[in-house]
């Protein structure tokens, strides 16, 4: 299918959240306390953060998701709209609460632990997926938060030859179907090893590719960069080096930037470099989205 006449670059299906972020010297032991040196509120969620990266890189993004009608739901909607993301299919669930996360960041390393509640809002169902939006998109990005709805959306995209990038990092019943129907799987290395039962990234990538014969499988490895397998070759990419403040959202930014790179026609080595650059720059600031650069900031680092 030709994609140049489509209106949306990347449509995302999955988490939009509100993040509460505290910085600590170290994590307390059970029963102990640790003072926070900094506390901030930021927009978050896997897909919402990924789409923010798409929008800031100059792409046209849309989200399919459900929020509550609470304070945090209002903040999520306002932020996505402010970022230029199409929220026509961001459903409000009356009387329900939204997805909320608390991120505890280690001051010296930027590493973080995340605690979250999904809220009382309902999940997306297949009937909530607008087929016209899927068909109007150059690429689809999804996590596994909404299960059946995401599988349905992936099926629509698969039938029309639209690339589907998955962001899956924990077990759910829908994972096998999403891996079958998706085209590009970007997986944290620890989950990749767990999912395949292998001991090293290279063997795990091959094992997963043999299961699904996807166009590409990428293992993200934090400050060790990423490695991909396309069924013939390994492609390696170093992490982009910055002074790290907070790694929250870096993987989500990698996913979003990579999905946008597909719509720009980038080959795998170029796209991995693009995603690594933008994800690395994100880590300069607290929060999943605050540090995401705008395209203009990349003028001396990247040529679109």
Short names for language-model regions:
Residues 55, 158, 263:
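Gly/Ala-rich phosphate-binding loop of Rossmann-like dinucleotide-binding domains
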Residues 38, 64-69, 88-98, 169, ...:
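Beta-strand->loop->alpha-helix junctions that form or flank phosphate-binding loops
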Residues 88-93, 103-139, 144:
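Conserved phosphate-binding/catalytic loop of the ribokinase/pfkB sugar-kinase fold
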Residues 1-66, 71-78, 82:
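Glycine-rich phosphate/adenosyl-contacting loop at the front of the ribokinase-like
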Residues 154-236:
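Conserved phosphate/ATP/ADP-binding segment of small-molecule kinases
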Residues 121-130, 148, 166-173:
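Active-site glycine-rich loop that binds ribose-phosphate moieties when present
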Residues 2-8, 35, 201-304:
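Conserved phosphate-binding/catalytic region of the ribokinase-like
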């Amino acid at each position: 299918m030709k994609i140049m006449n489509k209106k949306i670059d990347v449509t995302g299906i999955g988490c939009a959240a509100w993040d509460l972020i505290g910085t600590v010297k170290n994590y307390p032991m059970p029963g102990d306390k640790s003072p926070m040196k900094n506390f901030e509120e930021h927009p978050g969620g896997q897909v919402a953060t990924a789409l923010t990266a798409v929008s800031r890189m100059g792409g046209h993004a849309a989200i399919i998701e459900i929020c509550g009608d609470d304070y945090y739901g209002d903040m999520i909607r306002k932020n996505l709209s402010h970022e230029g993301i199409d929220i026509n299919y961001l459903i409000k669930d009356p009387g329900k609460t939204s997805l909320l996360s608390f991120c505890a960041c280690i001051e010296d390393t930027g590493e973080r632990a995340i605690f979250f509640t999904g809220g009382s809002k309902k999940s997306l169902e297949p009937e909530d997926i607008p087929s016209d939006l899927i068909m109007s998109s150059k690429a689809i990005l999804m996590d596994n938060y909404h299960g059946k709805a995401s599988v349905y959306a992936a099926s629509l995209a698969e039938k029309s030859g639209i690339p589907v990038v998955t962001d899956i990092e924990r077990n759910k019943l829908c994972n096998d179907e999403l891996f079958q129907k998706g085209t590009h799987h970007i997986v944290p290395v620890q989950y990749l090893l767990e999912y395949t039962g292998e001991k090293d990234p290279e063997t795990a990538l091959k094992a997963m590719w043999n299961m699904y014969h996807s166009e590409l499988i990428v293992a993200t490895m934090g400050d060790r960069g990423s490695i991909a397998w396309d069924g013939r070759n390994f492609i390696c990419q170093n992490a982009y080096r910055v002074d790290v403040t907070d790694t929250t959202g870096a993987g989500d930014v990698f996913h979003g930037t990579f999905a946008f790179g597909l719509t720009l026609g980038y080959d795998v080595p170029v796209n991995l470099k693009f995603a690594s650059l933008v994800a690395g720059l994100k880590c300069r600031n607290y929060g999943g989205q605050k540090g995401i650069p705008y395209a203009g900031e990349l003028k001396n680092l990247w040529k679109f």
